[in-house]
Amino acid sequence: MNINISDAIKYIGVDDKDIDLFESQYIVPNGISYNSYVILDEKICVLDTVDKRKTDEWVANLENVLDGKTPDYLIINHLEPDHASNIQLLADKYPDMKLVGNAKTFNMLPQFFDIDLTDRTVTVKEGDSLNLGKHTLSFYMAPMVHWPEVMVTYESKEKVLFSADGFGKFGALDTDEDWACEARRYYFNICGKYGVQVQALLKKAAKLDIEKICPLHGPVLTENLSYYINLYDIWSKYEPEVDGIFIAYCSIHGNTEKAALKLYDILKEKTDKKIAISDLSRSDMAENVEDAFKYSTLVVAAPSYDGGVFPVMNDFLHHLKIKGYKNRKVAMIENGSWAPCAIKSMQPYFDEMKGIEISDAKVTIRSTMTAENEVQLAALADSII
């Protein structure tokens, strides 16, 4: 696929609609794109490569744009294999081409490739520039967004930010869907742990005059950039995007599910806030993580199991912990037929998170929901709305 970002800047990335799991863990029903770009000037540069799954298609796109010319530079914004797998191929194909990266790039690169880097590298630091002729590139370090060597590249003539994995999303480019949903799921599951680092990058970007954002996944952003930047600001500050409630439950024989659904109905009667609900056992974990971050309040409902909490809830809370979940209101419901212990197992996760306000209105169900439990659920609802 060749797309004109401008007369001089070309998109040469590829869609991957055959992949079942991105990073061997995230379902991508609409596939994913691996984005790569070329700037045609007195000096020609390629910005990042693509995953090895799509090498042949990418090489064809590249050769079509180059039209017999030779690239002078390969900009390595990110070394992760879905963007860097073809560095070796390109270095071998064009032996006079220079590799442009930062010190961490070239420290890590030999771990992936056997390339003689002698006289082949251009090592850049924060704010360094590379002149291509009419176009000038400037480089800004973005460590841990979401790898240590990541940098972004800014082209000043056409005011384009090549943002690495920042502003990326799941989904092939020809997918007709709202950007925010799959960008949010991508952000919190890929970059969510690194909000402080994303904030640092946003502050650098705020000093640049940006008219287009070219990420390594998802569409090129060309209009209403403040919308996308504002969402990234909210997400990376760990602030709720929506003043609402997300009920995450799991249930072995359906009794905890009945309690969760009852709470959902009670909340619908009591408040106009947005209410979302999900069965953790039968839904995408990455989407559940996304929704936990999206809403201001989280309710977890789970049965006791093997002296702890049902495994899928344990997995869910572990995901939230490692992604830096914070600054939310939380309420808990447990079920147990003889020794309820789910809350005791869930509580330590929240105790380790920052800015978590836990409702005192905890609910314990003994096998099946009673009239008293329904009163308790109403009290829980009152405590979180």
Model-flagged regions — what are they?
Residues 86, 284-288:
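Short acidic active-site motifs
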